[in-house]
């Protein structure tokens, strides 16, 4: 099931985030039999899932798995709720990444986005985890998202092709990003190292809307 995309004109002042208490059942709709298991962790990091709909005793949450945009319903008693005041919007047409806090814009960065052959998929996603970079070229950290490449299924024998937000990789790509952004990646979103560093406090579960 896919939830409606975030209306970029109405960036929410906050988003509720559900932390699973271990692996829990997921449901196609409230009151129906369970049809899946929501993992308690994702690549070793706790599952922190943004809430997109609420009914009495039930929550609809986004999932980090393929297909892109997947959601499921969970019982409210199976999760612990917190709140993130942040939201990220990545505009592929302007090649910029914008960060909002409590509904107000706080950052706007030029970004490297996917090329026409390996585009950055549009849709409504979330930040799943902040992980150490595979090398210093990726910046101080990588923000992994729930977005997955549509053109690549196995990036460098990793078993998947998850869209990340990270540094520019090379000085040449850094120069291409410049002040306006550029289509230079295999789908990931690249930022200047100094801009990426400003995102260190963005928590897992923060919604990310990628628009064209």
Mark where each language-model region is:
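Post-signal peptide N-terminal regions of Sec-secreted extracellular proteins
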Residues: 70, 75-81, 89, 104-105, ...
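Extracytoplasmic
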Residues: 12, 19-23, 46, 54-58, ...
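A mature extracytoplasmic/lumenal domain signature
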Residues: 30, 55, 63-67, 78, ...
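SH3/SH3-like beta-barrel superfamily modules
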Residues: 37-77
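Boundary regions of SH3-family modules and the immediately adjacent low-complexity/disordered segments
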Residues: 1-11, 64-90
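Exported/periplasmic cell-wall-interacting domains
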Residues: 65, 78-86, 134-212
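Beta-loop motif signature
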Residues: 1-50, 164
């Amino acid at each position: 099931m896919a939830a409606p995309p975030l209306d970029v004109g109405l960036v929410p002042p906050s988003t509720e985030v559900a932390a699973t208490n271990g692996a829990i059942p997921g449901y196609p709709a409230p009151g129906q039999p369970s049809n899946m298991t929501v993992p308690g962790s994702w690549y070793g990091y706790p599952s922190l899932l943004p809430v997109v709909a609420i009914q009495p005793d039930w929550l609809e949450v986004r999932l980090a798995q393929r297909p892109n945009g997947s959601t499921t319903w969970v019982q409210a008693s199976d999760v612990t709720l917190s709140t993130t005041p942040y939201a990220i919007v990545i505009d592929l047409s302007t090649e910029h990444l914008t960060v909002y806090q409590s509904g107000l814009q706080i950052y706007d960065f030029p970004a490297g986005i996917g090329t026409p052959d390996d585009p950055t998929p549009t849709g409504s996603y979330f930040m799943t985890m902040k992980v150490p970079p595979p090398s210093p070229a990726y910046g101080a950290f990588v923000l992994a998202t729930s977005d997955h490449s549509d053109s690549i299924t196995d990036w460098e024998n990793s078993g998947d092709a998850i869209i990340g937000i990270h540094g520019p990789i090379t000085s040449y790509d850094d120069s291409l990003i410049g002040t306006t952004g550029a289509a230079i990646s295999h789908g990931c979103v690249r930022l200047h190292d100094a801009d990426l560093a400003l995102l260190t406090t963005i928590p897992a579960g923060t919604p990310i809307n990628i628009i064209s």
